[in-house]
Amino acid sequence: MAPNIRKSHPLLKMINNSLIDLPSPSNISAWWNFGSLLGICLMTQILTGLLLATHYTADTTLAFSSVAHTCRNVQYGWLIRNLHANGASFFFICIYLHIGRGFYYGSYLYKETWNTGVILLLTLMATAFVGYVLPWGQMSFWGATVITNLFSAIPYIGQTLVEWAWGGFSVDNPTLTRFFALHFLLPFMIAGLTTIHLTFLHESGSNNPLGITSNCDKIPFHPYFTLKDILGFTLMLLPLTILALFSPNLLGDPENFTPANPLITPPHIKPEWYFLFAYAILRSIPNKLGGVLALAASVLILFLTPFLHKAKQRTMTFRPISQLLFWILVTNLLILTWVGSQPVEHPFIIIGQLASITYFTILLILFPITGALENKMLNY
């Protein structure tokens, strides 16, 4: 019998082993769809971003008007821009749900896959930040000023580091130029890291909702999960299209319709919604360096989760106390997101501080204790 080209060709063989004949657990739920959704987000963002870059000018005098020109005069430029801007929001929705799934089902015990995933999150956050600066509106400019300024809190080298990042003594033309270069480069880095992420995942195979080995019951990825993924794509791309067509500015800041002006500070400087939880943690500490450390810790804490797993069971499926704690953590993050969008005034300051303390307490103290407690209750 002639060999199947899908299984013998050096390149097709790799695609076959990761997308067609990949042995997958038969019981993985819709929570396992977000990986492929993130892949679609990345592809959409690179495509729309490339089309936008062909019409964009990375110069302080022209950036704002070049974006306006794209929306007004380029064929479907408005649609490309709206898909790109809102695509970022969907990217973050998917990655947060993907991380939440990994946390709930103990997927972090695949340490290499988890760590590359956290690096991917950090790279995505960096990409979104530099991208937000490019339209050169008021919030772009002041957001860049505030966030880059945080590096000056680093002892001894801080100020030098900030001026080096700016390419001068303030956020100006050199800053915009290098941010555009970074925004163009980083998505391709994300694509490269994604292949590493998948390589590590395919070493162990997928986890599943029961957290037990699924070697005794595997099914091929195609046609079962290819079809399931395509359903996921339509369920994500439909709301994205609706948002981009009907209310494209819903998630944006009205301040960004005003061109950047270093002489006028907006009344409330705040980042896009997907950074608000971290921004709230940053603001909740009165000390600059302390705030920066808390901000970094809020994301870097994810690297510690594999070491804080004390339960004998992998997933939270049969651990009700941990489940309760997990949903309290989710609620807490929503509270932080809301507080981050509010002005720095009386009730919000204390709410933010309490929510920040709760966030770290749950992750660092309560989860390991609960895991150990459940072991005792189950007589492990």
Curated annotation (Swiss-Prot):
- In this chain, heme b b566 is annotated as bound at H98, H197
Q: Where heme b b562 is bound, by residue? A: H84, H183
The UniProt note on the cofactor reads as follows: Binds 2 heme b groups non-covalently.
The membrane-spanning stretches of this chain are: 34-54, 78-99, 114-134, 179-199, 227-247, 289-309, 321-341, 348-368
**GO CC field:** mitochondrial inner membrane; respiratory chain complex III
What UniProt keywords are attached to this protein's entry? Answer: Electron transport, Heme, Iron, Membrane, Metal-binding, Mitochondrion, Mitochondrion inner membrane, Respiratory chain, Transmembrane, Transmembrane helix, Transport, Ubiquinone
Q: Which GO terms describe its biological process?
A: mitochondrial electron transport, ubiquinol to cytochrome c
The protein's matches in PANTHER family, at most eight in alphabetical order, are given as: CYTOCHROME B (PTHR19271:SF16)
The note filed under miscellaneous reads: Heme 1 (or BL or b562) is low-potential and absorbs at about 562 nm, and heme 2 (or BH or b566) is high-potential and absorbs at about 566 nm.
Q: Which family does it belong to?
A: Belongs to the cytochrome b family.
Recorded protein name is Cytochrome b
